[in-house]
């Protein structure tokens, strides 16, 4: 199956098919007539898929280089980006060449950031191998690196030339790495796709159930992401709905130390916490927070953060991109399957951090 992202300035397609990674070289050759490609990946994914992709691309006549960095959120930094710039320059990569991001969300965000800034921008493709990347971060053109102050504090908007999603790659993930992706999937059902929410309700929450339903949940998630990106490419309106749970979630990631709490795990905790307080403030119907709690618990996502410190978390989220002056925008749910943006005084976020 295929999802078309029909942006007027940069249309591209998302190919979703079991086993399609084995045809990645052919897919790339139909999109690009470039001479040189650099694959950016991490130390885990390189072992699993690096050699296969290199061989496929060489078979199509491409000159191929590989840059691999230590796996994990701690590598999503300007320091690692600088190392990649040096690698690209050493191999004389030009704007007529291309980058392929092969891996999970960290790889995709970092590789896309590098591609969008090296020589003021070169073309890139996304081949996501984690559930979080397949349903969310590889789509829509947000790139970024972390700082000590905030997650994704430095970044750009840059669309890929295409996205290749093979659900079979999920079978090589560890259980925790697979389950954390369900945080984003649950979010999609909550904000815009009640059919997806019902699919999740029918699943038993096991690893096998995630893998068995992967094609459906990836497709539904990509459709929701596509809708929001087409309506609001630069995150000024509707696309902000995708941030449900992320304001508190990102603060948790920073507080815990990048990589200690995975992104989807932090989003799950953030959705539950924000919803509970929004219900107390009569901004959301009673019971939704419990629905979210139960769904996250069923799939094995964390529902609490043991090191909770509201003052430190508030200081972190005051640097959030959704803050503007003395106000910040949060996403709430009028009902299951629907979202809206609500602006509040930044100081009121302290209420949302009360346990």
Swiss-Prot record:
User: Which reaction does this chain catalyze?
Assistant: 7-phospho-2-dehydro-3-deoxy-D-arabino-heptonate = 3-dehydroquinate + phosphate
Chief location: cytoplasm
Q: Which domain of life is it from?
A: Bacteria
Tell me one GO molecular function of this protein.
Answer: 3-dehydroquinate synthase activity
GO-annotated biological processes: amino acid biosynthetic process; aromatic amino acid family biosynthetic process; chorismate biosynthetic process
Free-text remark on how the cofactor is bound: Binds 1 divalent metal cation per subunit. Can use either Co(2+) or Zn(2+).
What cofactor does this protein call for? NAD(+); Co(2+); Zn(2+)
Q: Which residues bind Zn(2+)?
A: 184, 246, 263
CDD domains, sorted: DHQS
List its EC numbers: 4.2.3.4
Location comes to: Cytoplasm
Q: What NCBIfam families is this protein classified in?
A: aroB
Q: What does this protein do?
A: Catalyzes the conversion of 3-deoxy-D-arabino-heptulosonate 7-phosphate (DAHP) to dehydroquinate (DHQ).
Protein name as it appears in the record: 3-dehydroquinate synthase
- Species annotation: Streptococcus agalactiae serotype V (strain ATCC BAA-611 / 2603 V/R)
């Amino acid at each position: 199956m295929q999802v078309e992202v029909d942006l007027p300035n940069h249309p591209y397609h998302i190919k979703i098919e079991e086993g399609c990674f084995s045809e990645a070289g052919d897919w790339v050759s139909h999109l690009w007539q470039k001479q040189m490609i650099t694959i950016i990946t991490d130390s885990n994914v390189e072992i699993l898929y690096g050699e296969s992709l290199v061989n496929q691309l060489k078979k199509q006549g491409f000159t191929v280089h590989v840059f691999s960095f230590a796996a994990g959120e701690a590598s999503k930094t300007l320091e690692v980006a600088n190392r990649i710039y040096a690698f690209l320059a050493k191999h004389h990569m030009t704007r007529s060449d291309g980058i392929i991001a092969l891996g999970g969300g960290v790889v995709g965000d970092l590789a896309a950031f590098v591609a969008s800034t090296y020589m003021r921008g070169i073309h890139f493709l996304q081949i996501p191998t984690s559930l979080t990347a397949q349903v969310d971060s590889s789509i829509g053109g947000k790139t970024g690196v972390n700082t000590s102050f905030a997650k994704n504090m430095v970044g750009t908007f840059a669309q890929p030339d295409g996205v290749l999603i093979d659900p079979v790659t999920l079978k090589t993930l560890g259980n925790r790495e697979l389950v954390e992706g369900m945080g984003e999937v649950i979010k999609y059902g909550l904000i815009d796709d009640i059919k997806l929410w019902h699919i999740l309700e029918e699943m038993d929450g096991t690893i096998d159930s995630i893998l068995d339903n992967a094609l459906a949940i990836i497709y539904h998630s990509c459709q929701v992401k596509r809708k929001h990106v087409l309506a609001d490419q630069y995150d000024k309106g509707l696309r902000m709905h995708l941030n449900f749970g992320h304001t508190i979630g990102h603060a948790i990631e920073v507080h815990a130390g990048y990589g200690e709490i995975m992104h989807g795990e932090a989003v799950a905790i953030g959705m539950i916490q924000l919803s509970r307080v929004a219900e107390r403030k009569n901004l959301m119907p009673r019971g939704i927070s419990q629905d979210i709690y139960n769904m996250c618990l069923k799939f094995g996502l964390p529902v609490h953060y043991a090191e909770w410190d509201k003052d430190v978390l508030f200081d972190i989220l005051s640097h959030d991109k959704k803050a503007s002056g003395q106000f910040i925008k949060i996403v709430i749910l009028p009902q299951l399957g629907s979202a809206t943006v609500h602006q509040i005084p930044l100081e009121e976020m302290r209420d949302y951090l009360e346990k």
